[in-house]
Amino acid sequence: MAVPKKRTSISKKLIRKNFWKKRGYWTALKAFSLAQSIFTGNSKSFFCNK
């Protein structure tokens, strides 16, 4: 017979949620930084024709 799983604690849920949000924040920051360097022409790792 199937038994329902135990409920995840609120603190554990918040830790996982914050980790997920922080990862998204750093990814967005990197993307913005790359866009800025491409726009100003100071990029050393990304080549594009102007």
From Swiss-Prot:
Q: Which HAMAP family match?
A: Ribosomal_bL32
Query: Main localisation, per the record?
Result: plastid
The gene from which this protein is expressed is: rpl32
State any GO BP term from the record: translation
Q: Can you name this protein? A: Large ribosomal subunit protein bL32c
Domain of life per record: Eukaryota
The record's comment on protein family reads: Belongs to the bacterial ribosomal protein bL32 family.
Q: Which organism is it from?
A: Lotus japonicus
Task: Please state where this protein is localized.
Answer: Plastid, Chloroplast
- Gene Ontology cellular component? chloroplast; large ribosomal subunit
Does this entry carry the keyword Ion transport? no
Keyword Amino-acid biosynthesis attached: no
